[in-house]
A protein has these predicted regions:
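Glycine-rich phosphate/adenosyl-contacting loop at the front of the ribokinase-like
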Residues: 1-75
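Conserved phosphate-binding/catalytic region of the ribokinase-like
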Residues: 3-6, 203-304
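Active-site metal-binding loops of divalent metal-dependent hydrolases
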Residues: 11, 136, 260
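Short glycine/proline- and charge-enriched loop/turn segments
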Residues: 19-27, 105, 239-246
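Short, conserved phosphate/pyrophosphate- and ester-handling motifs at nucleotide-, phospho-/glycolipid
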Residues: 44, 193, 258
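Conserved N-terminal subdomain of the carbohydrate kinase-like
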Residues: 50-133
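Conserved beta-alpha-beta core of the PfkB/ribokinase-like small-molecule kinase fold
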Residues: 130, 135-208, 212-216, 222-226, ...
Length: 304
């Protein structure tokens, strides 16, 4: 039986600025499909490894746009739920001079808060190899409980769980420290960025992260590349590997680069790639992402 990949989490709309500067000074934005799990799902599809995607979309105009994008990318709608009484979450992006970004979220009464994983039955999970989840659905109930239920059932079915914390402090409505500790204890592969680590949610020491639960930790550092730190329980055994990344002279936007990296990691994990090969591939996918306007609805060549 062919083993599948399941990505689960939010899809939302990113508004990408047409110029650099503070949000209050930007005069024009472009609408783009986004949300870290949605970006990962689309990235995998563009790498010819189309996953299942479990999400909840509104039925407003933005929700219809997201559904259209997912359909265009060939992602099955079997686990795409609809919430007719909700709106689509919005994220406005602002860029500094170095192309880095900040997010301003509008997330009241939105569909992602109604995230529902009940449609993914245990029988489905028996055919799944890797389940990918993110941190945003952990920030609010009932989405938090739905995420944990899916992960618990996935582990019971023998799936590997890949987790990207995607820390957004302004979104938390439940205790972040307790939630993150529980999630780390259920994680096989963790992918984190410099921005995710530290504070009250995640330790900065890779060994502490491994002690918290994961067998493998991928730490990204933007254009400085990434590291993989793993213990004996990982597919690669115990060790540490590094890739220095790729120089990109024409960076347009870094939004979604981390999600592209995650897609590369999952693809390599499913393919059984060696650590050096996997890191090089994931860094290449992420680097290419920075050369186009961000999000799921950008140029399809981005992760090909």
């Amino acid at each position: 039986m062919t083993r599948e990949t399941l990505v689960a989490g939010e899809a939302l709309i990113d508004f990408i600025p047409g110029e650099r500067g503070a949000l209050a000074t930007v005069e024009a934005f472009s609408r783009q499909a986004g949300g870290a799990p949605a970006n990962v799902a689309v990235g995998l599809a563009r790498l010819n490894r189309t996953p299942w995607f479990c999400t909840t979309l509104a039925t407003d105009a933005f929700g219809e746009h997201l559904a259209t994008v997912l359909d265009r990318e060939g992602i099955p709608d079997r686990f795409v739920n609809r919430a007719p009484d909700a709106q689509t979450a919005l994220a406005f992006v602002s860029h500094g001079r170095d192309a880095d970004r900040e997010f301003t979220f509008y997330r009241q009464e939105t569909a992602d808060r109604q995230f529902d994983t009940s449609g993914v039955g245990d029988g489905v999970l028996e055919s799944v190899d890797v389940v990918v989840v993110g941190g945003v659905t952990l920030t609010v109930e009932p989405a938090r409980s739905e995420t944990f239920d899916l992960v618990e059932r996935a582990l019971a079915a023998g799936c590997r769980v890949c987790f990207d914390p995607n820390v957004r402090p302004e979104l938390w409505e439940v205790d972040p420290a307790t939630t993150m500790r529980r999630m780390l204890s259920m994680t096989d592969v963790l992918k984190g960025s410099r921005e995710d680590l530290g504070g009250d949610t995640l330790p900065t020491d890779p060994e502490e992260l491994l002690d918290a639960g994961p067998d493998a930790v991928f730490l990204t550092a933007g254009d400085a590349g990434a590291r993989l730190i793993a213990d004996e329980g990982s597919p690669w055994g115990r060790g540490e590997w590094r890739h220095d990344g790729y120089r990109v002279d024409d960076v347009v936007d870094t939004t979604g680069a981390g999600d592209a990296f995650t897609a590369g990691v999952v693809a390599g994990l499913v393919d059984g790639a060696a650590p050096e090969e996997l890191l090089g591939f994931a860094n290449a996918v992420a680097a290419e992402m920075t050369t186009t306007p961000a999000s799921s609805s950008s140029a399809t060549s981005r992760t090909s």
